[in-house]
Regions:
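N-terminal membrane-proximal hinge/A-helix region immediately C-terminal to the signal-anchor transmembrane segment
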Residues: 1-103, 117-121, 144-149, 346, ...
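Conserved cytochrome P450 K-helix E-x-x-R motif and the immediately C-terminal K′/meander segment
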Residues: 23-52, 243, 247, 316-356, ...
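Conserved cytochrome P450 K-helix/beta-meander segment immediately N-terminal to the heme-binding cysteine loop
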Residues: 83, 368-418
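Cytochrome P450 heme-thiolate monooxygenase catalytic core
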Residues: 88-99, 137-286, 302, 473
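C-terminal helix/juxtamembrane-tail motif
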Residues: 255, 475-495
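Short, small-residue alpha-helix embedded
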Residues: 281-293, 451
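Cytochrome P450 heme-binding "Cys pocket" and the immediately downstream C-terminal segment
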Residues: 299, 366, 428, 441-477
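Cytochrome P450 heme-thiolate "Cys pocket" and heme-binding signature region
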Residues: 394-448
């Protein structure tokens, strides 16, 4: 006989008759604001107690949400999922693919916002080309050209104080989109050019799409009742992206391989999905890593020392160069630990399941709050401290710190505690886990490594403003303008 407790007794905010818990988000006061879900998660974490779970039941148009605040529990759920794991739906995107533009997508709805057999069938066609390590490694030289062009553009958009413009996050969107075009479509989209007509249309679509997503996917679904202005902007952007993917298919890139076997439509649908999930996420990761390094002179100097040793200034980088940059990779991991681009991943469980000692019914949506776990002391000692060394292997640490560990006592203490604690494999999952993890993970990592290597090899980057705050859009992005200050390293003495 099961000793699990009844689901009814799982802690959580009490739903009201008829309207359930939806009223909390409808009113929109802390801690129940869709753009401040980080605050909501910390509130629920306090409710859960040590290693427990919390439910938010009876949300209008949504299944019950269950939040297990335990890396061990997260591991159990992930490891027992079936061959076709179900993620939370993106209702508006699903509507676009499966209803509004069904004549185009038909039986090939893609990977995003799709579940079950259609998702599994499409994934089987495209996964080999995306997951194979050699595919992303082969793309490094072309991505390096994009990174070089973007860093050159950064120099051009600096003001008289050598400060980047307030819309620098949009510039990072352009870089990310140009990068996806390079490796997925095998072409340059022109996003980094000032007067390219296609590029202007693309950027307009980027603005329209990313401003529409949080309103449509996180707020009350008014678009189901009538075509709101935001809904129209969203659909126009998706149509434009779809046309772009068909128009820009070439005989190069990952999608060209797919087209040879499965046809241009499958290749274009894959390209569309890659654009939808590979632009704002990668741009946000780049922004956060720049911010943490700009605020941490010690880590920035360590990174620059590694770059000076392993990457000649004018060299076109390849995958072997990236292999020699463990500290750069640790800097990115540490940034994504503190500020993951997605606060949590989810699964819609397909059978009754015991979670944190409670019987959870089939159909519930389990949300894995990685943002909370990766910022807790029990998994990461001194979690608010930016310490890339915690991700390094023992043999890499002494060189990265320029000296024996005892030289920097604070960092050494954090590293030793982390070594004793270990890093739980399910405490920080910025790319997800399992068959539904980010399918473009290797490409995104290469994009980030190349861009950040170029920036910090060339510049000292500083931040002269206060602490950045973040919002959920649904990507976790900074609110304030990213006005970094850049100085050429060869024109300014190193500290």
């Amino acid at each position: 006989m099961s000793s699990a407790r009844c689901y009814t007794y799982m802690p959580g905010p009490r739903p009201l008759p008829v309207i359930g818990n939806s009223w909390r988000f409808a009113i929109g006061k802390n801690p129940w604001r869709t753009r401040a879900l980080d605050v909501t998660l910390w509130f629920l974490r306090a409710w859960a107690g040590t290693g427990g779970a919390v439910k938010v039941a009876k949300l209008f148009g949504h299944p019950d949400l269950v939040f297990p605040f335990s890396a061990d529990e997260t591991a159990k759920i992930y490891r027992r999922e079936d061959a076709m794991p179900h993620r939370a739906k993106a209702p508006c995107l699903s509507h676009y693919k499966q209803e509004l533009r069904k004549n185009f997508f038909g039986e090939e709805p893609g990977l995003i916002g799709v579940h079950g057999v259609p998702w599994s069938r499409f994934r089987s066609k495209v996964s080999k080309a995306l997951i194979a390590p050699e595919a992303s490694r082969a793309a490094v030289p072309e991505l390096d050209y994009v990174a070089n062009d973007f860093v050159s553009r950064m120099e051009c958009i600096l003001d008289s104080n050598r400060e980047l413009p307030k819309d620098f996050l949009t510039e990072l969107y352009k870089w990310a989109l140009e990068s996806v075009g390079a490796w997925a479509l095998g072409t340059r989209l022109g996003c980094l050019k000032e007067n390219d007509a296609d590029a202007k249309d693309i950027i307009k679509c980027i603005h329209g799409f990313f401003h529409s997503v949080p309103i449509l996917e996180l707020s009350a679904p008014l678009w189901r009742l009538y075509s709101t202005p935001t809904y129209k902007t969203y659909i126009e952007a998706l149509d434009a992206f779809r046309t772009l993917c068909l128009k820009r298919l070439t005989d190069k890139g990952i999608c060209a391989e797919i087209a040879k076997t499965y046809g241009e439509k499958v290749a274009a649908i894959l390209a569309l999905d890659l654009l939808l999930v590979g632009v704002d996420t990668t741009a946000a990761a780049a922004a956060s890593t720049m911010y943490f390094l700009a605020n941490n002179d010690r880590a920035q100097r360590k990174l620059q020392k590694e770059l000076d040793k392993n990457v000649p200034q004018a060299k076109i980088m390849d995958c072997k160069d990236l292999d020699r940059l463990p500290y750069l990779k640790a800097c990115i991991k540490e940034s994504l630990r503190i500020k993951p681009v997605i606060l949590g991943n989810g699964r819609c469980i397909q059978s009754d399941t015991v979670i944190s000692g409670y019987d959870v019914p089939k159909g519930s949506h389990v949300v894995f709050p990685h943002y909370i776990l990766s910022n807790e002391e029990r998994y990461f000692p001194s979690p608010k401290e930016y310490v890339p060394e915690r991700w390094l292997r023992t043999q890499d640490v002494s060189e990265a710190m320029e000296c024996p560990l005892g030289h920097d006592r604070k960092i050494a203490d954090v590293w030793r505690k982390q070594k004793e604690t270990g890093i739980h494999p399910f405490a920080s999952l910025p790319f997800g886990f399992g068959r539904r993890m980010c399918i473009g993970k290797r490409f995104a990592e290469a994009e980030l490594q190349l861009l950040l290597a170029k920036i910090f090899h060339r510049y000292d980057v500083t931040w002269r403003y206060g602490e950045l705050t973040y919002s959920v859009t649904p990507t976790y992005v900074p609110n304030e303008p990213l006005r970094f200050t850049l100085h050429h390293r060869n024109k300014r003495s190193n500290k």
